[in-house]
Amino acid sequence: MRNNGKKIRLLAVATLLASQLGVFNSAFTVVADETTASTSEPALVTNTSSEDGSTNHSTSVTATTEVTTSASSDRGEIASSSSEDTEEKTVKIGEIQGEAQRSPLEGQKVAIKNAVVTKTDRYGFYAQDIESDGNSRTSDGIYVVSKYKVKVGDKVKITGTVKEGYMEEVTLGAGKTFKEPTNSLTVTMLVDAWITKDGTAPLPEAVNITAGMPAEVKINPTAYDPETDALDYWESLEGMLTVVKKPHVLGPQYKGDIYVLGEDFTGLPLNNIGGLNLRPHAQNTATIPIYVGNQFVAKAKDYFAEDVTGVVTYRNSFYKVEPTQQLTVQDGGLQRQAAQTQPSEDKLTIASYNIENFSANNAKNETPEDKVTLIANSFIHEIHNPDIITLIEVQDNNGSVDVGTTSGLESGRKLASRIKELVGKSYEYTEVAPVDGADGGKPGSNIRLGILYNPERVSLAKKEAATSNEAAQFDKGHLVKNPARIAPNDPSFDHTRKSLAVEFEFKGKPVVVIANHLKSKIGDDAIYGVSQPAVEHTLPTREAQASVIHQFVQEGLKQNPKTTFVLTGDFNDYDFSTTAQILAGNELTNLMSQHDAGDRYSYFYRGSNQVLDNIFISNNMAAKATFEPVHINASFMKEHGRASDHDPVLVQIDFSGAQIPGTPTDDQKGNSGQATEQTSPSSSNTGTQLVPHQAQANEQKSSTSKSLETTKDEDEKQEDKEEAATETKTPGKRKILPSTGQETSYLALFGVAVATMSLVWYKKKRMTH
């Protein structure tokens, strides 16, 4: 009895000390052998390392999750599950992963007896079966949430509970509240894990990720088919070692990721910089994101001289590879280009440029002076001082500092002033200020469309400017007020930028320039998301906006068929989209769709070169127009001279001859169609002389069931906001353990858990004697 009493007292003391250590441990962080793929603040937890053959319990705590949904689909969201202690089942990792997006053993306690550590990070490690189950439809790898210190190559035995969770939650900083990602898949992981080292083992052979990649994400939301569905193919590799053969880079590093193609990729023709352009109904699933960290500098055409090996994970609604090696990129030699279009006396040159949240506020996180100079120099040296420059994303004078100001005159004039300082050329600026807070964009910034013009080359039609809510109208073919916004009170323009119409005169001829920044793609489904088929939820709004703008142009041409209309801007939609088709109708020519296919892009996002910026011209002058995108930004990082996230696009219109009669010919009608093939990397990058052609309407059918989830700058800015919201500080609350997607246990439950662990330890120790 004395011995039993002594043991009970020792157990109670151990329990108390363990509870106190649980709080004390929050003051320390242990960093594993390799850095994590997240830049988030780590959860603050210690661990106790042990020698080979010893056992250590993970400090993870598992409870019931908050979110419950139907489990009828293997692509569903997290379902509630219990983590009550049960006898573990010995399985291979492939059995845990299963032939589905979710584990068939979710919520169950399992034991893995013969695995090797393939990669570590601050929150746990990746393990893979030493002997595969031979089933290519199931992954042999898994992520283990644990602070137990292991090294790559350690042979381990693991006991833990199967969980479908989020890597964003695992890497969440201490004291921050987790917000479940919208439309995001989960990652199969082990939590509440016990780890036993058992010597070392060689790493399994990495799977060539390019070799088996399907060409699309199929629209069957329930069937699991990794042979033909890219989403399921990625799932079949989740947590496994993979390799990309000597990849080349497709675009600039963004948020720590680069997109690449392996040297063995043969699926599609490449564009003129070795990338893949978006095309109708093509998702470019072969592009592979690799995490490299946000200090890594890379641009399009750079390459790796050796294979890149890493494990597959999923976060922020897409799969990626986290390398297991130090990467060194080689310079591929891509240079920022200058426009081939040169100024000409009888030719009107118009540029469209998204200058990415530009204001007169020169604070570091607003528009610093070096950015002003970069953009001004791009006007001077890369696009050769156009006569008219339409500006997208001009903010009010204070930038994002919200003091109720809506005027952006100081912002526009600051850019004009910098151009004059650098080259001596004078530009004037015009705009119509929005209603405060009514046009979307960065909070407090009131972004709008603005126009710079050279008064020595063009004259602004002398009219009173419209107010924010006055709609642009024509009288005898001329704007009643100038400038004016198109249908500012139309519901399709709620909380987004209103198109700006400005009438100029060039060589005695009227030219109406309409600057546009249509509804962003924020809210569209991700290709690699829960919702399948993915849907472009924002497309109907852009289609409605396009219809309003087109009707406005129709009315102007009806009143004066000789007026030249030029529509410029960031349309937040592709050159082959139904939005572009509606805009063009029978009156306008879609210039980008006529351009060389291998050079047809102005933006880069998630692996694809794409068109968001475009110019449309009325058919009465289309045959006299030369168009080109000027690739100075989208493929580059700031370190290479990038001034914005968009490339400018440029049109030059020859007014030296007679204007084509106002009524378009059959060949000039409906020019939103285009060829979809791409050229080889040696394709010409010159400007394109345009001849309108009949629309290929069969390629322009509206489809909200097949999304090309390749969103633009505002989507990325929204991601920043969502990430900030995900990591909102919780006053007075501090998480001690890495989050596992379940409620933080109460203190009493924690004490019971520690007591139980102590008892287990005691029993095991007793059994060894």
What are these regions (language model features)?
Residues 84-349, 353, 357-361, 366-385, ...:
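Extended non-catalytic accessory segments flanking core domains
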Residues 656-658, 726-742:
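Short, aromatic-rich amphipathic segments at membrane interfaces
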Residues 25-94, 106-107, 662-733:
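Low-complexity, acidic Ser/Thr/Pro-rich repeat tracts that form intrinsically disordered stalk/linker regions
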Residues 12-23:
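Bacterial N-terminal signal peptides
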Residues 2-11, 744:
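Bacterial N-terminal signal peptides that target proteins for export
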Residues 323-662:
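Divalent cation-coordinating acidic motifs and surrounding scaffolds
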Residues 1-5, 40-43:
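N-terminal secretory signal peptides that target proteins for export/translocation
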